[in-house]
Amino acid sequence: MERGSRDHHRDHRDHREHRELREPPTLAFHMKSWKTINKPLKAFTKLLKENTTVTFTPQPSIIIQSAKNHLVQKLTIQAECLFLSDTEHFLTKTINNHIPLFESFMNIISNPEVTKLYIQHDSDLYTRVLVTASDTCTQASVPCVHGQEVVRDSGKSPLRIDLDHSTVSEVLKWLSPVTKTKRSGKSDAFMAHIIVQVNPPTIKFVTEMNELEFSNSNKVIFYDVNNMRFNLSAKNLQQALSMCAVIKTSCSLRTVAAKDCKLILTSKSTLLTVEAFLTQEQLKEESRFERMGKQDDGKGDRNHKNEDGSALASKQETQYKITNYMVPTKNGTAGSSLFNEKEDSESDDSMHFEYSSNPKRQRCVV
């Protein structure tokens, strides 16, 4: 009897020691797939700097999310690019993008010199990041961020318009004169307005300087259309479109007219998904856009007045913000890191557009 008890305790101790020595659940990149998205990731590093968190999920996936006023941007690295050793015991974990030893998580995954990257779950309080490069092998225990919400696209959309990559690039060039100015403010000169009309199906991009219009074609496809208007920050719209332009696929425009009406831009590839959630800005005074809208309402169906974006704008109080736990940085970057590369703003990875302003109204039909 006594011998059996000793054997039982010994087996229990051996099992506990084996469990403690066992490798913790580990998330890693498939290196072959990772190398194919290295260049897009480097471009995203320049677009996702401030107020950015990284979430690891057991699907597996990696979600990088950045929040600012009236704009949330999300980059998802899909399961086809990842390997997870233990899906049962790996729990969803969120950390800051800023990692002092490496500068940022985005800086790690976009560095071509990295040969191995492991994310390990062995504590609810922190995430262990192990990095191997050509001349270094190191690890860091990064504190977890708790209670951070990942913004998700939910609900049926009354609007869906697909723009091909060349059209997205054209809109970015057209926005350039407004967004290049060094002044800042919420005056109408810094606003971009989007008008969607049903008959005939058209989408207009309007600023105080100019406007751009597209009708149904093989480059701009209207699936679900309703008369709608959006008042957006021109810089927010430019940044959202720049995110979608990186992976060079079509960009889908949708909306969720719920608690806070959002314009959702989505672009997808096999390994990456980009989403941008824009909420409307409130206009303090009647703008050229509003005056033009009143003229359009006189020509169109009066029943669509209730769908005016200005009526929905009053619902835009809830904003997704990342606040007190973020690490303050200078110009969106930290001081030192193992991968201390200088960014060249004129490199091939930069999103750089030139556009000559034309005061006349433009209409694009293919």
Curated annotation (Swiss-Prot):
The gene is U27. Belongs to the herpesviridae polymerase accessory protein family. GO terms for molecular function: DNA binding; DNA polymerase processivity factor activity. Accessory subunit of the DNA polymerase that acts to increase the processivity of polymerization. It comes from Human herpesvirus 6B (strain Z29) (HHV-6 variant B). Residues 1-16 have a biased composition (Basic residues). InterPro entries: DNA_clamp_sf, Herpes_PAP. This is DNA polymerase processivity factor. Residues 313-322, 330-339 have a biased composition (Polar residues). Residues 1-25, 286-366 are annotated as: Disordered. Keywords: DNA replication, DNA-binding, Phosphoprotein. The keyword Phosphoprotein applies. Residues 286-308 have a biased composition (Basic and acidic residues). One of its GO terms (biological process) is viral genome replication. It holds the Pfam family Herpes_PAP.
